[in-house]
A protein has these predicted regions:
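N-terminal, polar/charged subdomain of small-to-medium soluble alpha/beta proteins
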Residues: 1-94
Length: 94
């Protein structure tokens, strides 16, 4: 699975990049036909929930999207990955 990370108004350090790669690559265990994944990080200001992560995942002929905001990118990533797991399980059951 190919993972592309895009950051807007965010300084993407190596530890955050590694965390994203580790967590998102584990989604392969829930569906083995994931083609590619785009992860978008965005910081929209100084508010409490201004850190946003969006995961866009291509599976066969479908595109799945999970979008979460939180005070930290790590928490937003956990929420988005959990949301994506649910979507992948639902598709696999069909």
């Amino acid at each position: 699975m190919k993972i592309d990370i895009h950051a807007k108004n965010v300084e993407l350090n190596d530890s955050l990049r590694q965390l994203i790669n580790n967590k998102v690559s584990k989604l392969n265990t829930f569906h083995n036909q994931i083609i590619n994944t785009d992860v978008y990080l965005r910081n929209e200001g100084e508010s409490l929930h201004s850190n946003e992560i969006q995961i866009k995942l291509s599976v066969r002929n479908q595109t799945l999207v999970a979008k979460e905001t939180n005070e930290s990118f790590e928490k937003a990533l956990d929420l988005a990955v959990n949301s994506m797991k649910r979507q992948l399980k639902k598709i696999k059951e069909k």
